[in-house]
Curated annotation (Swiss-Prot):
Primary localization class, coarse: secreted
Cysteine pairings via disulfide bonds: 4-37, 6-30, 20-38
Species annotation: Bunodosoma cangicum (Sea anemone)
Pfam family for this entry, one: Defensin_4
Protein name (record): Toxin Bcg III 31.16
Length: 38
């Protein structure tokens, strides 16, 4: 996946998802271009 920033935290960009993939330890997310930054 593409990296992205959620505030000052580096995350992974997921295209066209309504929630972050489960089981990967994500603690939060930000809205990002047509998807989420998790």
């Amino acid at each position: 996946g593409t990296t992205c920033y959620c505030g000052s935290t580096l995350g992974i960009y997921w295209f066209a998802v309504s929630s972050c993939p489960s089981g990967r330890g994500y603690t939060g997310h930000c809205g990002y271009f047509l998807g989420l930054c998790c």
